[in-house]
Amino acid sequence: MLIPRKVKHRKQHHPRQRGIASGGTTVSFGDYGIQALEHAYITNRQIESARIAINRHIKRGGKVWINIFPDRPLTKKPAETRMGSGKGSPEWWVANVKPGRVLFELSYPDEKTARDALTRAIHKLPIKARIVTREENF
């Protein structure tokens, strides 16, 4: 699973999710991609689940690029714990995703199979997303 090797600070603030993605909005490496249509925190488990769904569908024929990385820790306090006494311990690593961001890219010769694989991956993600192609960039 994707987690940072080393971080300067173990716990971070959680800013409001607002605005649209300024970079990473076009398909750069592959022929098809998954583009986010809303804000979300996507966990490392969700990213891994979507990657496995794509790879199982395309078998050995194509190549997958993951364009997001879970670099932000989310904390949680234990159940039945009283308020106060500091911030909870880090539980998950998440990627902050804004609308317009291309999350995954796929290079595959057959368009129908590629779209089916990306549709399966979209079902694993907690956001609304769409499939974009390299031709739509220009």
From Swiss-Prot:
<dbReference type="InterPro" id="IPR016180">
    <property type="entry name" value="Ribosomal_uL16_dom"/>
</dbReference>
<comment type="subunit">
    <text>Part of the 50S ribosomal subunit.</text>
</comment>
<dbReference type="GO" id="GO:0000049">
    <property type="term" value="F:tRNA binding"/>
</dbReference>
<keyword id="KW-0699">rRNA-binding</keyword>
<dbReference type="InterPro" id="IPR000114">
    <property type="entry name" value="Ribosomal_uL16_bact-type"/>
</dbReference>
<keyword id="KW-0694">RNA-binding</keyword>
<dbReference type="InterPro" id="IPR020798">
    <property type="entry name" value="Ribosomal_uL16_CS"/>
</dbReference>
<dbReference type="Pfam" id="PF00252">
    <property type="entry name" value="Ribosomal_L16"/>
</dbReference>
<keyword id="KW-0820">tRNA-binding</keyword>
<dbReference type="GO" id="GO:0019843">
    <property type="term" value="F:rRNA binding"/>
</dbReference>
<dbReference type="GO" id="GO:0022625">
    <property type="term" value="C:cytosolic large ribosomal subunit"/>
</dbReference>
<dbReference type="GO" id="GO:0003735">
    <property type="term" value="F:structural constituent of ribosome"/>
</dbReference>
<protein>
    <recommendedName>
        <fullName>Large ribosomal subunit protein uL16</fullName>
    </recommendedName>
</protein>
<keyword id="KW-0689">Ribosomal protein</keyword>
<comment type="function">
    <text>Binds 23S rRNA and is also seen to make contacts with the A and possibly P site tRNAs.</text>
</comment>
<comment type="similarity">
    <text>Belongs to the universal ribosomal protein uL16 family.</text>
</comment>
<dbReference type="InterPro" id="IPR047873">
    <property type="entry name" value="Ribosomal_uL16"/>
</dbReference>
<keyword id="KW-0687">Ribonucleoprotein</keyword>
<dbReference type="GO" id="GO:0006412">
    <property type="term" value="P:translation"/>
</dbReference>
<feature type="region of interest" description="Disordered">
    <location>
        <begin position="1"/>
        <end position="23"/>
    </location>
</feature>
<feature type="compositionally biased region" description="Basic residues">
    <location>
        <begin position="1"/>
        <end position="17"/>
    </location>
</feature>
<dbReference type="InterPro" id="IPR036920">
    <property type="entry name" value="Ribosomal_uL16_sf"/>
</dbReference>
